[in-house]
């Protein structure tokens, strides 16, 4: 019996939980409605302000278009700001053109009036000068008073003659017309025209004229140095007397083709007089036409002589017989192959 009232008390307490939840939900919903109501009020307040601004801008654009002369504004898009700006620029350009036309007509009328005054005898020169001075003074006063002027795209592009350099940040810039020009005749400076002058081409000289020219002949040695013979290989030592160009026969004169004359027409022996002849040229190169020259078959027979060792054959070098006219030896000089091999007891010299 004691447990029943306890159960009844629990049953009475159970419905209190969901009721409390419902109350909490009701309070939260009520608070949410208040918040949404406040945000809605702000949006409704901002929308009329924006709409009023757009309406004002549209009304201004419509008025401007009407003043420009557009009656059918419904066909145009008044909301487009760039379109209205373009119409305004066109109107300004047209106004400036009309002003220039009026100015030109006024100047033409003034010229006609001045011509008539000059032709008439009643008006003297003093009165004309006074009228011109008065007009000049009025122009200067008007320029000083009229500070606010409408800029036109035509007048702004013209260069100001008396413009100050401090007015713009680029004060150091100069115009081409301001730079004084100096002619080449005044300064006395002449520039050579290299590309316009044709180059002169001279044909190569023949062999007879080349050899007869005294300036082309090599200098004759005056002092002969006596050197020991052991420094030179056999047949290569200095000769006792060098023949001159006049003592040589006609066979010793260089018989050369046009190719060699065109390349060496400034003198063959001026560059390297004391140098040795080139060793890469074979014995068949008969440039100077020597009389005592061996045939290729005879030289091959001499080079194929039987030697005692194979190593000595690779070291033997036969010197060429052709030489320059200045270093031409006596015809009775016999040469033999020079051996550059270093002989050792293991490799004795050939016998």
From Swiss-Prot:
Additional information: Present with 736 molecules/cell in log phase SD medium.
UniProt gene name: POG1
Post-translation changes: Phosphorylated by CDC28.
Keyword Cell division: yes
Subcellular localization, as worded in the UniProt entry: Nucleus
GO MF annotations, alphabetized: RNA polymerase II cis-regulatory region sequence-specific DNA binding
Induction comment: Expressed periodically during cell division. Regulated by the SBF complex which is one critical regulator of the start of the cell cycle.
Gene Ontology terms: biological process: cell division; positive regulation of transcription by RNA polymerase II; re-entry into mitotic cell cycle after pheromone arrest; sporulation resulting in formation of a cellular spore
Principal location: nucleus
Domain of life: Eukaryota
Family the UniProt entry places it in: Belongs to the POG1 family.
Residues found modified as Phosphoserine: 152, 168, 314
Keywords, ordered alphabetically: Activator, Cell cycle, Cell division, Mitosis, Nucleus, Phosphoprotein, Stress response, Transcription, Transcription regulation
Residue stretches spanning the membrane: none
Residue ranges, compositional bias (Polar residues): 27-56, 241-256
Region (Disordered): 1-56, 234-256, 291-351
Segments of skewed composition (Basic and acidic residues): 1-26
UniProt protein name: Transcriptional activator POG1
GO CC terms: chromatin; nucleus
Summary of the function given for this chain in its UniProt record: Transcriptional activator which promotes cell cycle recovery with CLN2, after pheromone induced G1 arrest, probably inhibiting the ability of STE20 to activate the pheromone response pathway. Binds the promoters of genes that function in cell cycle regulation, cytoskeletal organization, and spindle assembly. May also be involved in stress-resistance.
